[in-house]
Amino acid sequence: MTPRSYLYVPGDQSRLLDGAARRGADALIADLEDAVAVANKGAARTAVASYLDTGTAWVRINADTPADDLAAVADRPGLAGVVVPKAEPALLSEVDVLLGSRRVPVLALLETARGLRHLHAVAESPRVVRLGLGEADLAGELNLRPGPDREELWPIRSAVVVASAAAGLLPPVGPVHTAVRDLSDLERTTELLLRQGFRARTAITPTQLATINAVFTPSAEEVEKARATVALLSSGTGVAVDADGRMVDEAVVRSAREVLARSEGLQEQ
């Protein structure tokens, strides 16, 4: 199953790590970066390495200490992948070398102007299977003051969606929603991300997971409509008209197949 939700868990909080797998996230990210104070980085590496002996998680490393972070976790059986913050080609190349022959995928977070400048190189880097956005860091570096709908960042979101598709990656992962108690706004902004081409979102608290998962799960009505669309074209001559009077061609069917693939992937988990 392709994850719809990724839950960040502070790497130095063993109790939270141990309980996180039961909170409803499609994937966990054991965080060695922002969620951990500098003084606790060593303890966090030890705690995450211990967790990965029996549990499964992605690990977000630090951009300035990739060697130390990967030395602690790269050989643990539960390492699902590495989240690279502030992703730029040079850092991704360094991570690739450090991982060596290990078959470890990478989720690259776009959080810097330089990373955006080299967006397609980031998307095409070895090991990268998915892109994500760190909009707080980007807004700070670009001197943006985003409004409630964050329109100021929409061009960047579109660029990340295009780069992902062009490189054959999974659809990208949306940024965290920092108003942790406002689940209504979380739903609204996650639906916006869905329309913009994202198919997952990161979370910073378990209470956000049900909302995120629901938005990225095709409804029964959507699945039924998608099946009808695919069947309509398969029985026609390349172009057809559906019950609503809408022209159906291969481009429309491609979107319908994407809905069905997401639904079937969830049923297989």
Regions found by a protein language model. Give the residues of each.
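Expand to "…catalyze enediolate/carbanion chemistry for C-C bond making/breaking, isomerization
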Residues: 1-269
